[in-house]
Amino acid sequence: MTAIALSIAGSDSGGGAGIQADLKTFSALGVYGASVITAITAQNTRGVTAVEDVSAEIVSAQMDAVFSDLDVKAVKIGMVSRRETIAAIADGLRRFGKRAVVDPVMVATSGDALLRPDAVAALIEELLPLALVVTPNLAEAALMTGRAIAGDEAEMARQAEAIMRTGAHAVLVKGGHLKGQEATDLFFDGDTLVRLPAGRIETRNDHGTGCTLSAAIAAGLAKGVPLIEAVSAAKAYLHAAISAADRLEIGQGRGPVHHFHRWWKD
């Protein structure tokens, strides 16, 4: 049977992040992708110029349509900017007995804010207890824990432990913004702390990296891969996609990663 994954996220008109990046990732990894759109963004490699939220009612209707027909094996949640939307998503997950990969998208790669302040508490209170794994970057982890942005791996670990106390099953704190030759993420499931290093890649093409990573984790879970293995494989896929990104030459700003690097010829 074909593995199916669902992305609940915003649409990126430039195609590099959000729903578009998620569906590309699912396809690249051999998983059928379904989608629930939470917002429509006017966005390109240079930034976000406008955001139109989709109503909570339509978000619920999309979830009902997908879950009532498709045998969804994994769910990934990305951009959800409104408290009402978060409540609708949490309700849908509970009704259909689903947990999710939660990418707490708060700030775009360009630096534009994507999550309203009153929605941060709702995300922590309603979505994190339903998370199989939550994947914050350093700024998001700091915002979620009320601490300063981590400057080293020891503080990353402390913030991972704090996020676990929200009820999440596991946490992956992404350390790509730390200084150094490595981009090291920390995975914590309440018992074991796993260090996941990778060589740092110097490139302007890093738009949608967080979306791609969380979608790749969901793709692995949809195929029945254990969580830590899905996380490790997703990080390897993202690293390869970033390494190949310069071949695309898309946009005038921070371009997308190369989701189909294994298949497209130069």
Curated annotation (Swiss-Prot):
Enzyme class: transferase
CDD domains noted in UniProt: HMPP_kinase (cd01169)
Binding locations of 4-amino-5-hydroxymethyl-2-methylpyrimidine: 43
Residue ranges crossing the lipid bilayer per the database entry: none
Coiled coil region boundaries: none
GO molecular function list: ATP binding; hydroxymethylpyrimidine kinase activity; phosphomethylpyrimidine kinase activity
Pathway(s) of this molecule: Cofactor biosynthesis; thiamine diphosphate biosynthesis; 4-amino-2-methyl-5-diphosphomethylpyrimidine from 5-amino-1-(5-phospho-D-ribosyl)imidazole: step 2/3; Cofactor biosynthesis; thiamine diphosphate biosynthesis; 4-amino-2-methyl-5-diphosphomethylpyrimidine from 5-amino-1-(5-phospho-D-ribosyl)imidazole: step 3/3
Keyword line: ATP-binding, Kinase, Nucleotide-binding, Plasmid, Thiamine biosynthesis, Transferase
Catalysed conversion reaction: 4-amino-5-hydroxymethyl-2-methylpyrimidine + ATP = 4-amino-2-methyl-5-(phosphooxymethyl)pyrimidine + ADP + H(+); 4-amino-2-methyl-5-(phosphooxymethyl)pyrimidine + ATP = 4-amino-2-methyl-5-(diphosphooxymethyl)pyrimidine + ADP
Name this polypeptide is given: Hydroxymethylpyrimidine/phosphomethylpyrimidine kinase
Organism: Rhizobium meliloti (strain 1021) (Ensifer meliloti)
